[in-house]
């Protein structure tokens, strides 16, 4: 009994480490795995960073590609390799900014000051402009001449959002410094906008080097399978070698399992970006426990089901019969008027036709009750108003549009427990009750 208990404790400890390592890999783009299909882009990026870090040469570059194409992973790989060269980790500074967080110049400047650990140097100094403040910060890092100054790598995530800020002051000053003989800096922007250069002001564009790296998900299914296996494998330095060997052997078996191959092929056909794969693996990893220590094909099938789940159709499963009836009435209105907007009164009239045809008093709700159910559907965002509601307009006559298509409605009704037969028949009828 005690042996089994100690074995469970060892398994629990190992699984805790597995969860930590893999979650970190899936969520934070940690540079563990090999890069696939981007060797040329990687070489270009690492050479540019080395020129800044080693030779004090300022540069600017944009990494452009759709979401999930591996922009952050590529950059993290390059930064990791750079920091492993000599004493680069001590001499090269990194400043990470995000367009979603640093929404104006003032916030960005505070974040730059914090990341460079220069709060004490700035103190209570008052600066006339953003450029003066930024120049002061970079001068504080200088040790003498250009080659011995401390290089700074600025990473601007969601770069296009910085382009929407007033006067593009941050971008202008960073690019301006990268063109002048001041502190050596590299400005690396990450964006999913292919038209990013069109967003830049003329003065900003003139100071940008126009270097761009484009990333596309160009790998095929065999490479996708290789990535799956590698992402799921534990590193060689994992403490428990025996457990790691078993885990990696299981990952290899999964990559050859016909059920898993079918799941991955379906996932690949829908969306082949790595974020989507990471989400699939994360959901499967959540099912791994002490009593179920290794991932199975069933876990991946369940994860695939959760990934492909229709959120709006899931909401329909929790609606009342009255709300279901209103959605069916709207479905018929869509069929009759060919997706044209409708109002509550039209939906109510359609619902009344159903009641009169069936002569069921059980569905005979008062109009205010039906109105309340209609408003609840609007709160759930299953229907949306076509125009802004005004104080004087009558609620019954405001135009709305249904945000569910016929397939979603019928699939949801199939899974709706205890749905009355006549309501189900009404939904499947091709014409409304006339």
Curated annotation (Swiss-Prot):
GO terms for cellular component: chromosome, telomeric region; cytoplasm; nuclear origin of replication recognition complex; nucleus; origin recognition complex. The keyword Nucleus applies. InterPro entries: AAA+_ATPase (IPR003593), ATPase_AAA_core (IPR003959), ORC4 (IPR016527), ORC4_C (IPR032705), P-loop_NTPase (IPR027417). The keyword Nucleotide-binding applies. It is found in: Nucleus. Gene3D superfamilies: P-loop containing nucleotide triphosphate hydrolases. One of its GO terms (molecular function) is nucleotide binding. ATP binds at residues 65-72. Component of ORC, a complex composed of at least 6 subunits: ORC1, ORC2, ORC3, ORC4, ORC5 and ORC6. ORC is regulated in a cell-cycle dependent manner. It is sequentially assembled at the exit from anaphase of mitosis and disassembled as cells enter S phase. Interacts with DBF4. Interacts with POLQ. This is Origin recognition complex subunit 4.
């Amino acid at each position: 009994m005690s042996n089994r208990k100690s074995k469970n404790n060892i398994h629990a400890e190992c699984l805790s480490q597995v969860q930590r390592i893999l979650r970190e890999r899936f969520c934070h783009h940690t540079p563990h795995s090999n890069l696939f299909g981007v060797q040329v882009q990687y070489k270009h990026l690492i050479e540019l960073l080395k020129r800044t870090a080693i030779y004090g040469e300022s540069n600017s570059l944009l990494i452009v590609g759709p979401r999930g194409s591996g922009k952050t992973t590529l950059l993290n790989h390059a930064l990791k390799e750079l920091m492993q060269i000599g004493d680069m980790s001590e001499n090269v500074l990194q400043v990470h900014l995000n367009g979603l967080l640093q929404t104006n110049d003032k916030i960005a400047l505070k974040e730059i000051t914090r990341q460079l650990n220069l709060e004490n140097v700035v103190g209570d100094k008052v600066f006339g402009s953003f450029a003066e403040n930024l120049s002061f910060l970079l001068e504080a890092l200088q040790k003498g001449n250009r080659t011995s100054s401390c290089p700074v790598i600025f990473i601007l995530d969601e770069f296009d959002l910085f382009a929407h800020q007033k006067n593009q002051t941050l971008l202008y000053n960073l690019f301006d410094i990268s063109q002048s003989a001041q502190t050596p800096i590299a400005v690396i922007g990450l964006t999913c906008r292919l038209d990013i250069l069109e967003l830049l002001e003329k003065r900003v564009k003139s100071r940008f080097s126009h270097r761009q790296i484009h990333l596309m998900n160009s790998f095929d299914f065999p490479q996708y399978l290789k990535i799956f296996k590698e992402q799921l494998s534990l590193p060689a330095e994992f403490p428990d070698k025996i457990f790691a060997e078993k885990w990696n052997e299981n990952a290899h078996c999964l990559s050859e399992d016909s059920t898993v191959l079918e799941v991955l092929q379906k996932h690949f056909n829908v969306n082949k970006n790595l974020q989507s794969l990471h989400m699939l693996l994360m959901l499967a990893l959540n099912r791994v426990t002490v009593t179920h220590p290794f991932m199975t094909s069933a876990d991946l099938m369940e994860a695939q089901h959760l990934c492909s789940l229709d959120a709006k159709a899931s909401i329909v499963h929790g609606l009342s019969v009255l709300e279901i009836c209103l959605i069916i009435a709207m479905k018929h209105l869509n069929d009759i008027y060919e997706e044209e907007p409708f109002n509550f009164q039209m939906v109510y009239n359609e619902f009344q036709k159903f009641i009169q045809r069936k002569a069921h008093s059980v569905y005979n709700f008062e109009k205010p009750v039906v109105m309340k159910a209609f408003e609840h559907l609007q709160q759930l965002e299953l229907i949306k108003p076509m125009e802004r509601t005004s104080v004087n307009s009558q609620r019954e006559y405001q135009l709305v549009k249904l945000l569910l298509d016929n397939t979603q409605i019928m699939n949801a009704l199939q899974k709706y427990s205890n749905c009355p037969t006549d309501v189900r028949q009404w939904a499947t009828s091709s014409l409304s009750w006339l």
